[in-house]
């Protein structure tokens, strides 16, 4: 073993799901903010979003409002990139408040995406619950799911996309950033 390998902490202990993990603490706010900047930049670089693309107009369309007990739900689509659409549902409380907290609610890895409504999980149920608690909630399709079929969920990524330095993770992250802009 070389001296460099002997000092490599990854070679000293094999970690598994039973290994205790202590989160690093930061003695000052400035140290944490520096670390947060580093992490943010690292994520953007790894997803092909450094530098960030320009934020073009979203051109949102909100329509098809249905009112139910304590909430309303509307259909939404907007452009995260010129000609690329993010589709979803906007849940709003019916409490009449002018300003309410907003929640971006991704669907996770469920087979039916934002429309998953099973014993294990109900994405619409989660959104309805949050809206009835007074929050505006947006649940959107990941690329390749439900109404967002401009690209296939597993088909995006290859030599052409590599030339641009963006893959499906970068596209999903960019769509999520634009969801926050929409809210």
Give the positions of each predicted feature.
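A generic structural signal for ordered alpha-helices
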Residues: 10, 17, 21, 56, ...
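Serine/threonine-rich low-complexity intrinsically disordered regions
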Residues: 2-3, 16-22, 114, 123
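Non-catalytic accessory segments flanking enzyme active sites
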Residues: 12-91
């Amino acid at each position: 073993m070389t001296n460099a390998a002997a000092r490599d902490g990854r070679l000293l202990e094999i970690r598994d799901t039973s290994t205790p993990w202590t989160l690093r603490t930061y003695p000052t706010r400035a140290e944490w903010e520096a670390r947060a900047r580093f992490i943010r930049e690292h994520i953007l670089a790894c997803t092909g979003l450094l530098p960030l693309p320009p934020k073009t107009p979203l051109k949102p369309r909100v329509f098809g409002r249905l009112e139910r007990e304590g909430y309303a739900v509307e259909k939404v689509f907007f452009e995260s990139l010129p000609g690329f659409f993010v589709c979803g549902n906007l849940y709003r409380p019916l409490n009449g408040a002018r300003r309410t907290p907003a929640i971006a609610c991704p669907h996770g890895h469920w087979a039916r995406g934002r429309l998953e409504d099973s014993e294990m999980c109900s994405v619409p149920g989660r959104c309805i619950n949050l809206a009835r608690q007074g929050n505006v909630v947006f649940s959107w399709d990941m690329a390749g799911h439900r109404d967002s079929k401009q690209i296939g969920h597993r088909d995006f990524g290859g030599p052409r996309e590599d030339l641009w330095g963006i893959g499906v993770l970068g596209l999903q992250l960019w769509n999520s950033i634009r969801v926050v802009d929409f809210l």
